[in-house]
From Swiss-Prot:
Assigned protein family: Belongs to the ferrochelatase family.
Gene Ontology cellular component list: cytoplasm
Subunit structure as annotated in this protein's UniProt entry: Monomer.
GO biological process: heme biosynthetic process
Protein name as it appears in the record: Ferrochelatase
EC identifiers of the protein: 4.98.1.1
Major localization listed first in the record, in broad terms: cytoplasm
Organism (species): Escherichia coli O9:H4 (strain HS)
PANTHER family referenced in this protein's UniProt entry, alphabetically: FERROCHELATASE, FERROCHELATASE, MITOCHONDRIAL
EC main group: lyase
SUPFAM superfamilies: Chelatase
Keyword Metal-binding: yes
Length: 320
């Protein structure tokens, strides 16, 4: 019997190619055109997106990207490439490709890269620990479109999420412990997850339940009392209600109530990016301190740390 050759596809959201209004506009147009992300009627959404949102948001968002841009590109791209390279070193007999839902490298280029290595089985690992239709679902949709154009398709193993994976929880817990050892134990550990519209959850997206699962498992691994750990949601967009409580409003409230020391982790982000390094580490720090808080630290994402790479290797091992 011929032995199956397996490849691994690491998938993430994507990023602009440069911190310029033009590059950000191209990226946002692709991102915000996905029905998994915004499911508003196209007749209403297209004029709003092209006539208002892209012209107004692109220059502003480009400045935010410029504030965190790294020598090798956007933080998400730099750390994602490091993850790909480290996992390939950890699994030298297994091709590892990186693909983004929006921007480059695309998911299609990642599939083609693996097929060029003559793999006949692909393990797809979306780097979203908690499933959502707007992230993991978007990867599934694009993968289906890509394979629909192929005469011969490989076997596919698709990892839905890993919200309560033992290695993932332990890696998060060790990261928190290291931060506590460096900065002292805070009055509160705040776990900030990317938000989604509340309507998506009402219609069946189990993302909030998966976030609660991670929060519960992490608090248990740390041995922290429930009142010392809080879960919030960030990065809301548009006018409809999103999952609550909102991170920025919660930090303002906590500062006003006299909570002095907070540390914030974003367990849903496998790699640091604009939403963690600018929104959480900078903007929300100012919100908390401006409301009366005294001390605020952001705990970095797992990025390409050895524990994170080992977690990925163990996660895909069952499918290889």
């Amino acid at each position: 019997m011929r032995q199956t050759k397996t490849g691994i596809l690491l998938a993430n959201l994507g990023t602009p190619d440069a911190p310029t209004p033009e590059a950000v506009k191209r990226y946002l147009k692709q991102f915000l055109s996905d029905r998994r992300v915004v499911d508003t009627s196209r007749l209403l959404w297209w004029p709003l997106l092209r006539g208002v949102i892209l012209p107004l948001r692109s220059p502003r968002v480009a400045k935010l990207y410029a504030s965190v841009w790294m020598e090798g590109g956007s933080p998400l791209m730099v750390y994602s490439r490091q993850q790909q390279q480290a996992l390939a070193q950890r699994l030298p007999e297994t091709p590892v490709a990186l693909g983004m839902s929006y921007g480059s490298p695309s998911l299609e280029s990642a599939v083609d890269e693996l097929l060029a290595e003559h793999v006949d089985h692909i393990v797809v690992l979306p780097l979203y620990p908690q499933y959502s239709c707007s992230t993991v679902g978007a990867v599934w949709d694009e993968l289906a479109r890509i394979l629909a154009r192929k005469r011969s398709i490989p076997g596919i193993s698709f990892i839905r999420d890993y919200a309560d994976n033992h290695d993932y929880i332990n890696a998060l817990a060790n990261s928190v412990r290291a931060s506590f050892a460096k900065h002292g134990e805070p009055d509160l550990l705040l776990l900030s997850y990317h938000g989604i519209p509340q309507r998506y959850a009402d219609e069946g997206d189990d993302y909030p339940q998966r976030c609660r699962t991670t929060t519960r498992e992490l608090a248990s691994a740390l041995g922290m009392a429930p009142e010392k750990v809080m879960m919030t949601f960030q990065s809301r967009f548009g006018r409809e209600p999103w999952l609550m409580p909102y991170t920025d409003e919660t930090l303002k409230m906590l500062g006003e109530k006299g909570v002095g020391h907070i540390q914030v982790m974003c367990p849903g982000f496998a790699a640091d990016c604009l939403e963690t390094l600018e929104e959480i580490a900078e903007q929300n720090r100012e919100v908390f301190l401006g409301a009366g808080g005294k001390k605020y630290e952001y705990i970095p994402a797992l990025n390409a740390t050895p524990e994170h790479i080992e977690m990925m290797a163990n996660l895909v091992a069952a499918y290889r």
